[in-house]
């Protein structure tokens, strides 16, 4: 399946590991916290991957502007520009106000759950976990 890829950084803030994606920090889940403790190689630049269906609209999320929206039955496919990056978001139509986001040139905010993110080494492109 399609995936959105973001330049990101893994770092430690306090006693927790976070992935910083598009300027927003995402605290990693416990299994990845443990794996990173063993690796002991942060901060490090990475690539974060998120599938379009794992992205949700969120009032406190990352800013984006809708370029194109496609109503596909029970889903709305949003093609957005976020800080110069093209991102595809697929959201159930039952979860959103269609008038607020359907169409072009509409501002939206999006986010994702860290447990649904994939992390890749920036140089080798191999999965980190």
Residue ranges and their predicted role:
Residues 3-5, 9-129:
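Non-catalytic connector elements of ABC transporters
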């Amino acid at each position: 399946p399609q995936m959105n890829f973001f330049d990101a950084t893994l770092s430690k803030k306090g006693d927790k590991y976070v992935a910083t994606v598009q300027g927003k920090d995402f605290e990693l889940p416990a299994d990845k916290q443990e794996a990173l403790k063993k690796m002991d190689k942060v901060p490090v630049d990475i690539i974060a991957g998120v599938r379009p269906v794992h992205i949700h609209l969120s009032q406190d999320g990352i800013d984006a502007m809708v370029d194109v929206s496609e109503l596909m039955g029970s889903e709305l496919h949003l093609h957005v520009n976020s800080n110069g990056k093209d991102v595809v978001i697929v959201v159930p139509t039952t979860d959103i106000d269609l008038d607020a986001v359907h169409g072009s040139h509409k501002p939206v905010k999006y986010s994702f759950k860290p447990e649904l993110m994939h992390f890749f080494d920036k140089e080798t492109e191999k999965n980190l976990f």
